[in-house]
Swiss-Prot record:
Residues 456-503 are annotated as: Cys-rich. A zinc finger (RING-type) spans 456-503. PANTHER family: INTERFERON REGULATORY FACTOR 2-BINDING PROTEIN 2, MYELIN TRANSCRIPTION FACTOR 1-RELATED. Residues 162-176, 335-366, 389-400, 423-432 have a biased composition (Polar residues). The keyword Zinc applies. Belongs to the IRF2BP family. This is Interferon regulatory factor 2-binding protein 2. One of its GO terms (molecular function) is zinc ion binding. Its main location: nucleus. Acts as a transcriptional repressor. GO terms for cellular component: nucleus. Residues 73-84 have a biased composition (Low complexity).
């Protein structure tokens, strides 16, 4: 015997993928011998269910299980004792079962090697059909003993050579759903949709392949028959899609928590048509928009102020509520509705405040890439965190501004004046909202770029952008380092040193005045010492 035949005789077939595997690649811990690849693919916790489903489908198709060579003598006893227990099947094997059903797959192996001993309760003892003549072979290929579209085997290559062949039509590289469509697998070849049990899958499989159950499958399937099956399958998928849409309409009347749970379940088990279409169905987006009170109130809150003087009818926030956006694709609507959740209500900042609101939607849509949307959401999150307290609308972003800020803190400071008014409806104070809406540019704040230059409260000299002392209680109290040093020396650095303005500014939320910490005093005074040393030298 050749070395290839010897190697092939040592291999055992996996119950799920039917590929010849070496003994060390097989796992005997489950109800059927399966290879490590299938266990890793499905997960050890799901593999029993998959084996069970495979067994049901094989029985429903009248599938002869005589293809797999038996296990090695050392493990045959364990396999025969476990064969009476039930096993399972994966999404990827359903596609293979549809076209290998009744097919003469045993030809390849039995033509090259004598059949190994088989367990009587699992494997039939019928003789394989004789090899086909060369004139009968078509364009179909057989990879690892698995028949591809037209069902012809190609026995001139040993299985282990086929395993390594760089065949582009290898079943592992074909999408599972497409393989199922080509090869005549039942509709349930993806993960089981909601509401479909294994029993109903078996019934559907038996119905769709009843033409093939009368003995062996013919050598070739006519193209008209194939097209008819394809149409039948497409109709079934469209019916599934219609069921999901009607379900989504029924959910509108349910409570919000129930509706959200149902939505999440539907998205995680979406059928073929919603998985492979480019745009998600707009019905779900609009029902989400229409039933989200937070997004409505957010859009109303955002509509109170406008950073640019366009008339109300052209504002971007009006179009965000789902009524006035016929031109907006469903994917963009989904993106906007995500960003309109209560913690990120900032409609005007989704488009640049200086851009022309009357431009066609393509311009705004192309300008907003998914990455830009992610960055924007991250910036908004930072801004919300920084201005959590309604009474310190701006001071929180400046509390640590005596040290050079990181780029993320600069982003927070830049976003703050735009974010704060849009958060007011969810629990801020109306006085700050009125101040922000009436004079959005009048605050002497470092967070507004290109605005009024920062000046020291005492000497009115212009301050550097990051190198000054900021009172944490009063936003307008900003001091240069020379004035701060002078104030510390006047108050005496040994005791409590309060705000350089001369007032005892209370901490936010209490009557206790804030005072410099010793480390801060040392830092401010240290600059003075360094300057003197430089002058002396």
């Amino acid at each position: 015997m050749s070395s290839a035949t010897v190697a092939a005789s040592r291999r055992q077939s996996c119950y799920l993928c039917d590929l010849p595997r070496m003994p060390w690649a097989m796992i005997w811990d489950f109800t059927e011998p399966v290879c490590r690849g299938c266990v890793n693919y499905e997960g050890a916790d799901r593999i029993e269910f998959v084996i069970e489903t495979a067994r049901h489908l094989k029985r429903a198709h009248g599938f002869q299980e005589g293809r797999s060579p038996g296990p090695s003598p050392s493990s045959s006893s364990s396999s025969s004792s476990s064969s009476s227990v039930k096993p399972q099947l994966s999404a990827k094997e359903m596609a293979q079962i549809g076209h290998t059903m009744g097919g003469p797959e045993g030809v390849t192996r039995t033509s090259q090697q004598p059949p190994p001993p088989q367990c009587l309760d699992r494997y039939s003892l019928e003789r394989p059909p004789p090899p086909r003549l060369g004139s009968e072979y078509g364009v179909g290929r057989q990879v690892n003993g698995i028949l591809l579209p037209n069902g012809f085997p190609k026995p001139e290559e040993p299985p282990e050579l086929n395993r390594q062949s760089p065949n582009p039509r290898r079943t592992s590289s074909v999408p599972q759903s497409l393989g199922a469509l080509m090869n005549g697998a039942p509709i349930g070849s993806g993960r089981t949709p909601v509401g479909l049990s294994a029993a109903s899958l078996v019934a559907a499989a038996a119905a769709t392949t009843s033409a093939d159950l009368s003995g062996k499958r013919p050598g070739s399937v006519s193209s008209s028959e194939h097209d008819g099956k394809e149409k039948h399958r497409a109709d079934s998928y469209s019916e599934l899609g219609e069921n999901h849409k009607s379900r989504a309409e029924e959910w509108i009347s349910k409570p919000k928590t129930v509706r959200d749970t149902l939505m999440a379940m539907q998205h995680s088990h979406s059928p073929f048509d919603s998985k492979f279409k480019k745009d998600p169905g707009p019905g779900r987006v609009l029902s989400f928009e229409a039933n989200n009170p937070a997004s409505k109130s957010g859009a109303r809150g955002g509509r109170k102020r406008k950073p640019s003087p366009e008339p109300e009818g052209e504002g971007g926030s009006v179009k965000m509520n789902g009524e006035g956006q016929p031109w907006l694709p469903a994917a963009e609507s989904l993106k906007i509705s995500t960003m309109a959740s209560p913690s990120f209500i900032s409609p005007p900042s989704t488009v640049s405040p200086h851009s022309n609101r009357t431009t066609p939607p393509e311009a705004a849509q192309n300008g907003q890439s998914p990455m830009a949307a992610l960055i924007l959401v991250a910036d908004n999150a930072g801004g919300n965190h920084a201005s959590k307290d309604a009474n310190q609308v701006h001071s929180t972003t400046r509390r640590n501004s005596s040290s050079p800020p990181s780029p993320s803190s600069m982003n927070q400071r830049r976003m703050a004046p735009r974010d704060v008014p849009s958060q007011i409806p969810s629990g801020g104070t109306s006085s700050h909202a009125g101040m922000e809406q009436g004079h959005p540019q009048s605050i002497p704040d470092s967070s507004i770029p290109n605005s009024i230059p920062l000046c020291c409260t005492l000497c009115h000299e212009r301050l550097e952008d990051t190198h000054f002392v900021q009172c944490p209680s009063v936003p307008s109290h900003k001091f240069c380092f020379p004035c701060s040093r002078q104030s510390i020396k006047q108050q005496g650095s040994s005791g409590e040193v309060y705000c350089p303005s001369g007032e005892k500014c209370p901490l936010v939320g209490s009557n206790v005045p804030w005072a410099f910490m010793q480390g801060e005093i040392a830092t401010i005074l240290a600059g003075d010492v360094k300057v003197k040393k430089e002058r002396d030298s």
